[in-house]
Amino acid sequence: MLCLCSSVHIQAQSVSSSTATSADGNYVEGVVRVKLQREIADRLVAAKLPLSVKGTSKKYVQTGVTPLDRVSQKVKAVSMTRVFPYAGKDEAKHKAAGLDLWYDVHYEASGMKLAQARNLLRSTEGVAYAQRIPVYKPIGGERFLEVSPAAVAKAAKAASTLPFNDPLLNDQWHYNNDGHIPGTKAGADANVFKAWETGVTGSKDVVVAIIDGGFQVDHPDLKDNVWINTAELNGEPGVDDDKDGFVDDIYGYNFVINSSDINAHSHGTHVAGTVGATNNNGIGVCGVAGGSDGKGGVKMMVCQVFDSRASSSAVADFGAAIIYAADRGASIAQCSWGASVADDEDKSVTAAVDYFTKNGGGDKMNGGLCIFASGNNGEEGNYYPGCLDKVVAVGSMAPDGSVAYYSN
């Protein structure tokens, strides 16, 4: 599937995310992600020992499971944390999918390289898989194809009618390219107008998880299409009213700082605007699925995985964000991020994608669909997770119908 990139977007404050990374910048430093075998994971839970040295005199985590304790001593593990947190009412479903088997091992062995720690854990009895964690980055916003204002004006003047009254729809040539702009080719677009003509403008029954930077939930062109957790909205502050393991997640959750505090992000707001800016409300731009009556279309859930306010060592758990979205009825996961992966497939994210594909959509849809950007490096190869078989990967097309120079 191909899409077009445009310089027209909804703008929030400009922020970026940073992480503590390995020397090559591709992996998160000081932590190895492991999947335990079922027997070992159950023994770990049964032991009920603290999986952190914080507040103790211990120099490394002691789990009560001999093979894990041995490798913990070697790498000087200071904590083990579940990748997919306790899920309250959804915990049984998570366990059935094996999500409770995943742990992050944080270590502090002096001079130990990340690959060395991974290999030690990989060879440990009871560890089914061990990997480094890729540093995922948002895709888009930096590279785009320029179209001059004069050319856009010429095209707008030539257009006799438009389906909606949003003032910047004229500028969204990537929705309906009629070839009037010099250097463009008629039909080299995303076929959005044709979809709208068939009545497909965005249903309120469809929940789209924006797994990206947080978006501006009170933006005048987005607010009518924001997903709302009514149990938390009408509940008691500071209480997990719906007993799902998350507190006060009214519009979604911030997986960078593990909080319901959503921070508007330029990339996330841009993506949300493309997906679901309200159509026919006389404001701003149109969203692909923003409805048709000025009252909204699809509902968009905030699953924040980029936030510059966090410390440099804070790393969002992308897989946990995908699982969160599935458990709350999202049928589409919009993911404009990824990473070049060498020898470490992020199987925790693969597990999350599999879970979303099977369980997304709640009781209104038969499963879910994850949509990933193919990447903007202008390269061939496996750009993860867009290279997975179960997802739809979307590249960029130039306005003349050719592959954009920067698209993977």
Model-assigned labels for residue ranges:
Residues V32-K35, S79-R82, Y103-H106, Y129-Q131, ...:
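Structural recognition of the beta-strand scaffold that forms the well-ordered cores
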Residues S123-G126, D221, N225, G284, ...:
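Glycine-centered tight turns that cap/initiate beta-strands
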Residues Q13-A155:
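Inhibitory N-terminal propeptides of secreted protease zymogens
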Residues K89-D104, R122-V207, F215-D221:
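Protease zymogen maturation seam
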Residues E125-A128, K185-S259, H270-T274, T278, ...:
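Acidic-leg catalytic submotif of subtilisin-like serine proteases
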Residues A190, E197-T198, G202-K204, G213, ...:
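Substrate-binding/access-modulating region of protease and related hydrolase catalytic domains
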Residues L36, I40-P50, M112-Q116, V217-D224, ...:
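Short, solvent-exposed loop/turn elements at domain surfaces
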